[in-house]
Every structure is written in C-alpha cells, then in structure tokens.
Amino acid sequence: MSGAIFTSLEGPGALDGTSGHPLVCPLCHAQYERPCLLDCFHEFCAGCLRGRAADGRLACPLCQHQTVVKGPSGLPPVDRLLQFLVDSSGDGTEVVRCANCDLECGKQDAETTYFCNTCGQPLCARCRDETHRARMFARHDIVALGQRSRDVLQKCTLHAEPYVLFSTDKKSLLCIRCFRDMQGESRVHCVDLESAYVQGCERLQQAVLEVKALQTATREAIELLQAMVEEVRRSAAEEEAAIQALFSSMQDKLSERKALLLQAVQSLANKAEFLDLGYELMERLQGIVTRPHRLRPAQSSKITSDHRAEFARCLEPLLLLGPRRAAGAGGGTSTLTGGLGPKVLRGPGCPSPVGKMLGSPVQKPTLHRSISTKVLLAEGDASPFTEHCRHYEDSYRRLQAEMQNLKDQVQELHRDLTKHHSLIKAEIMGDILHKALQVDAQIASEYASVEGLRAVFQEIWEDSYQRVANEQEIYEAQLHDLLQLKQENAYLTTITKQITPYIRSIAKVKERLEPRFQVPVDEPSDHPQNTHDDGVNAEAPARVSTLKPAMEKEVS
C-alpha cells in the first residue's frame, strides 16, 4: 500500500500468482485501503497509485489504460461501493464498555451486546436484564450492537428522519421531509424501501447473470485461442518436418543422380565403340572449339537491383498509396492548371495592366480536355466525376462569357483611347473594375469548390488504380505462362531432334532383323536399290551388338 511500490504488472497474466480475493489490492497484496476505481474498472489502493500520474493522466498498472485524473492529489475518487464492502467485511477489535458495569465487549461480541437508543448507551446482556427490566424502561428502544451499527445509515443526514422512500430517478434514499420538498413530477419516481429493495435485487441478479455470461464467453474465447495456439504450433512442427523430409529426399535423389552420372562418365568404351563414335565425338569437339565464345564477362561485378521501387510497388495496395497530384501554392498567388498554361488569380490590390490583359486573353479549354469531357459525358455513366464535369462545364462557360464581355469593353475603351487620345466613356471604368473583381471572386470560389473535391476523387482514383494494378499483374502472369510453355516446347523439340537419329537407326536395324516389318516391293525398278541396301546392311548385325549398349545409355 506504500507509494514506493512501482513494480509493473506485465498484463493480466500477472494476477495468476497473486491472491484472487476481491478485497485484496493486486499491488500491495493487502486489504484495500481507500480503494480508487479507474476507467478500466481496475481498483487499487490510493497509496499504491500515489505518484503515478503524469500530465493529468494515470496509467493502469495492470492494463496500461489511461485514466484522466483531476485535482492536486492526482488520484481518482474513492470507490464507495468497494469501501463499504471492505468496512463490512472487517474483523476489527473495536472495544466498547458497558455503561453500567464497564464490561469490555469486543466488536466480535456485537450480537450479544446491546445498545439503548433511548439512553444512547451500550449495555451488556446482564445489565440489560437487570437495569431495563423495570416498567419505566419498557418503551426504551434496545437493539443489538451490530444492528445499531447497521442502523446508523437508516436516518437522513439532512433532516435526521428515518428513510421511508427511494427515488428511482435520482437513486437516493428519502425521508418524509425530503419527499415533501420534492417537485410533483419527481414524486412519481418514489417507491417504498421494500419495493425498491426487491427491484434492486432483481436488477442486481440480472447484472450478475450478464457478468457470468460474459465470463463464460471470455473463458470459451481464451480456450479457443489457446487451442488455436496449439494448432499453430502443431502445424508449424508438421511443416518443419515436411521441409526436413523433402530436403532429405532431395539430397538422396541428388546423390543417386550424382552416382549414376559419375558411373556413366567413368565407364570405358571398347575399341570398336571408340572407332565407331570417336571421330564423331572429335568432330563435335572441334565444332565446339571453333564456335565463337565470350571469354570475358559482359557484366560487371556490381549488383544493382531496383528493390526499393519493387518494395514500394508491393506496399502500395496495403498502404492505399497512389499517384498524388502536387498542388503548388506560393505567396498570395494560386495556380490553376488544366488550360493552355497557368492561370494566376491576383488579389484586388495587384490589378494586372491593361496591356498585359489585352495581350493575354482568357485562355479557352484545351482541345484534348474539351473532347475528353464530351466523350465522358456522352458515355452516360452516372459517377461523381461525371456529375462534377457537367457542373464544371456550365460554370466554366458562364465565367468565360463574362470574361469575354469584359474583354470586349476594355478593348473598345483602349481603341477609343488610342484613336482619339481621350477617354470617351470614363463613367464605365468603375463598372468594369467592379465586374472584374466580382468575376475574380467567382473564379476563386469555383477553384476552391473544385479543390475541395480532390479528396473524394482521390479515393475513387486510388480504387481504380488498385484494380488496374491487379489487371496488369494478371496480364504479366499470363505472358509469363505463355513464355514458359514456349520454352518447354523448345526443350521438347530439341530433345526430339537429338533422339531422332537413334530411333531411325534402331528402326532400320529392326526391319532388317525381322522380315515381317519390311515393306513389300511391288515395282521391279526397286531391285537395284534393294541390292545396294543388302550390301550396306550386311554389316548391320555386327554393329548392332556394338552400338546397342551405348545407344541404350544415350536414350536413358
């Protein structure tokens, strides 16, 4: 309960080792003394919380929830409910003396010690029977000492009258005088103590049931989370075992393949095989040597990768990032983009010269923007941006017409001034300047309105950008799949071309060894060719026995 205890409880699990008694402080492990209730409904002794507040906020030692505290003490108010429970459950050794015989009676003997409310004095059991047996004491109000301590709160502190009613509106006990002082509409909410007690018990029972249901649901959720943690651990162990098994099997397969390759390399060929295939091997080696080879590396040793851009591109869908349009602002000038060039809004204190205004007419919308807007409006899609474009075109045409009107008037004045060397219509100069200021204010208002829609359109554009990014990713994956199929087909074609000579050779030898596979000869003109083939193939049986083991190795 000392203010020097500042050991932090690491989460709710720290309560497992402490006492689960509801009247014991989780910090000092002693009975509450002036318990204080925090906003997170955790309670601690006032002494345990003293000195923990910082900047008007008090962090809960259990869950770190911030509670706003007021006053110089830096402590929340004392919890009257828990304080009552602590006082009611106390087993103190308060000693009272009998007013007649001075017999000491402890508070634990409150049920066998009495108190006379009429006399205002405590009495032991023997003196109660001896002194208050007479008829003159028959009207004295004698109650047990414990009952007297509980009856102290049964009288109004304002009027010293016993409580008879309870206000369900203000949640307070009322005596008869408090009831009389209340307004008429407030008396409707007053009920007798017995009815209020029954209603309070029912509501308390309902609240207890709700808390028990919450405890049950919380316990089930904790069990579910624990089961899920066990499943995650078991799944991780199974995945690790699967990876280890796959790695071991891969090592075994690679070892077997290594042994087979080494055996094939280390096998010796006989002289016939060497004479039959050696020169072909030499020709291949000579061809390999004569082919151009790049003996120097074409790349440098420095590794450069666009990993930052790749990371940024991967994080864009998660952080809802998209192409941002930078809005430039400087001084008192605002730049409007979307025309042939920047349009500058100047304040009333800096009017543009007449010559510059005549030399820089109001720029009309670009052909690209006009055509794009017309196409967008012609599509008929109902979207916020379409409605904005439709409203913008109307406002822009109106402002453009006003600017053209002012331009014509100023050009006419300028023409009169240059021709006649005098200002013919001086009275309309003020009107033109006033209208120009009004148009300037309208343009600024329209610009602010359009600029205010940036956040709405930016969110819509970000969604569209995410969809386009997903489509691009799918498109690139499709191209990659097609390239992979093309590469596999190239490998297949190469392998087929490599094994074609061997298959044809085996087929010819098989035709010579098995006459039933031979094609019947119908035309006599083929006999000379067949005679030549017999001479060529006469040596085939002798070569088959020599080539067959080598070809089997090659095919395998």
Curated annotation (Swiss-Prot):
Q: Which domain of life is it from?
A: Eukaryota
Name the keywords, alphabetized: Coiled coil, Cytoplasm, Metal-binding, Zinc, Zinc-finger
* UniProt zinc finger (RING-type) residues: 25-64
* InterPro entries attached to this UniProt entry: RNF207, Znf_B-box, Znf_C3HC4_RING-type, Znf_RING, Znf_RING/FYVE/PHD, Znf_RING_CS
Give coiled-coil spans as residue ranges: 218-273, 385-425
Family annotation (SMART domains): RING (SM00184)
Sites binding Zn(2+) sit at 98, 101, 127, 132
- Gene Ontology terms: cellular component: perinuclear region of cytoplasm
Q: Name one GO molecular function term.
A: zinc ion binding
The UniProt entry, under PROSITE patterns, shows: ZF_BBOX (PS50119), ZF_RING_1 (PS00518), ZF_RING_2 (PS50089)
Q: Specify whether Metal-binding is a keyword of the entry.
A: yes
Q: Where is region (Disordered) located?
A: 517-556
Positions of B box-type zinc fingers: 93-145
What GO terms describe the biological role, i.e. biological process, of this protein?
regulation of cardiac muscle contraction; regulation of heart looping
Classification via Pfam families: zf-B_box, zf-C3HC4
| Chief subcellular location | cytoplasm
* Compartment annotation: Cytoplasm
Annotated Basic and acidic residues bias = 524-535
| Residues passing through the membrane, by range | none
Q: What's its job?
A: Plays a role in cardiac repolarization possibly by stabilizing membrane expression of the potassium channel KCNH2/HERG, or by assisting its synthesis, folding or export from the endoplasmic reticulum, in a heat shock protein-dependent manner.
Q: Which PANTHER family match?
A: RING FINGER PROTEIN 207
Q: How does it assemble?
A: Interacts with the core-glycosylated, but not the fully glycosylated form of KCNH2/HERG. Interacts with DNAJA1 and HSPA8. Interacts (via the C-terminus) with HSPA1A; this interaction additively increases KCNH2 expression.
Please identify the protein, giving its name as recorded.
Answer: RING finger protein 207
Write down the species.
Bos taurus
Lineage from the top down? Eukaryota, Metazoa, Chordata, Craniata, Vertebrata
